[in-house]
């Protein structure tokens, strides 16, 4: 009789564990579903909507920024490197603002550059766009060529604070 009683307690305990695990799985699936339902494309007001991508995609509290190149009004990279960097970062800032975020919400930045000797020119301008000392994780990688003569292409991920 005691053996049956112990088996029933174990079976009951296993049942409770399985029910609890199932509830957490349902909760996790609901959270993912809720985040996906809040997904929206971000477009700058002057965006070329003929291009097959968005300036960014906001999914829940996370913004994925498409690769950007610092092009002037003529659609080309400016002659001055500092101007190209500022145009690029101003565009990134504008995409973030469309999503209700700031540069300080960036958590990851990838910069492709056609001339790695420009690293030291890029950094002080880049740093000036942040108000926090806690900068995002970043990589600065070489690229053989970028579209429209650009020297830099930046893509990033931001998470709302």
Give short role names for the model-derived ranges.
Residues 6, 11-90, 94-99, 104-107, ...:
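N-terminal presequence-like segments and the immediate start of the first folded domain
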């Amino acid at each position: 009789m005691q053996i049956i009683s112990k088996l029933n307690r174990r079976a009951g305990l296993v049942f409770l564990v399985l029910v609890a695990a199932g509830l957490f799985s349902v909760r996790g699936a609901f959270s993912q579903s809720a985040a996906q339902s809040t997904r929206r494309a971000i477009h700058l007001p002057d965006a070329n909507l003929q291009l097959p991508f968005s300036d960014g995609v906001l999914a829940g509290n996370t913004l994925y920024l498409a690769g950007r190149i610092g092009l002037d009004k003529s659609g080309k990279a400016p002659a001055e490197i500092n101007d190209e960097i500022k145009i690029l970062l101003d565009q990134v800032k504008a995409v973030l603002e469309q999503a209700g975020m700031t540069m300080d919400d960036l958590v990851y930045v990838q910069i492709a550059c056609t001339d790695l000797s420009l690293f030291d020119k890029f950094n002080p301008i880049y740093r000036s766009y942040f108000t926090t000392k806690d900068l995002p994780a970043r990589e600065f990688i070489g690229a053989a060529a970028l579209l429209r003569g650009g020297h830099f292409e930046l893509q990033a991920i931001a998470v709302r604070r």
